[in-house]
Amino acid sequence: LVTGASGGIGGAIAKILGENGYHVFIQGRNQKKLAQLKISMSGNCEILLGDLNKSDDRANILNLAFANKPVDLLVNAAGLSSFVAFEDTKPEMINELMQTNLITPMLFTQEFIAKSNTEQNAEQKQVNVVQVGSAFGYIGYPGFSTYCASKFGLRGFTEALAREYSDTNIRFRYFAPRATSTSINAVSVDEMNKALGNAVDTVEAVAKTFMDFLNSKKRQQVVGWPEKLFVRINGFIPKLVDNAIQSKLAVIKRYLQQS
């Protein structure tokens, strides 16, 4: 079950899962995009249309997904981004972004666990719950304060659940892409990445890395270099990352003014 499948990363993950023999349920709010994705996918695929921010839709989606047999993989890929100076961020945007990126995935994960525990077969097959986060769930970055807060929260939530459920058949994992070429990005973000020389991945490359991650025993995965290094350094010597970002701050703020 892949949420946010009408988006770039979610759609690419759904597609590669289908190519690897999974029966995939694709969730989203855009019927047209989901229909186009289904046509492009190989293997079995079913559309689950609904808004995860609505409790009735979440319940209906899970009932349909579990109708015939238990679901052994949930990928929460639905999300929003925001590149805005914090003082210019409207309260409505903060609420919407935190709801979509953190609170709704928490609620849907809770409901998925309950459904999985009820419907799980006698073999107790391993279940994977993967939250699609971001490298900005490890590194606070100017202009993305609200987005970073949501992804930091999602990572902490995943880490806590992984430990809480370590004696069960459910594994909780966090997958963190870096900058990726998708429609979620504002034009100013794309232009800033070019100006700073930041690497930007295709959704296909991200999906391939996701598949490798899924087939591994890793609990967390940061996509790309030097982001992996920056994450490690930020954990031990954050001042070095402070200095690196400080040297780029004038450029970042120039593009913030355009957002």
Residue ranges and their predicted role:
Residues S6-G7:
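Conserved glycine-rich cofactor-binding loop
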Residues A85-F86, K90-M98:
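Substrate-binding pocket helix/loop in short-chain dehydrogenase/reductase
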Residues A77-S82:
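Conserved NAD(P)H cofactor-binding loop of Rossmann-fold oxidoreductase domains
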Residues S134:
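Residue(s) in the substrate-gating loop at a strand-loop-helix junction
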Residues N20-Q36:
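Conserved glycine-rich Rossmann-like NAD(P)H-binding loop of the short-chain dehydrogenase/reductase
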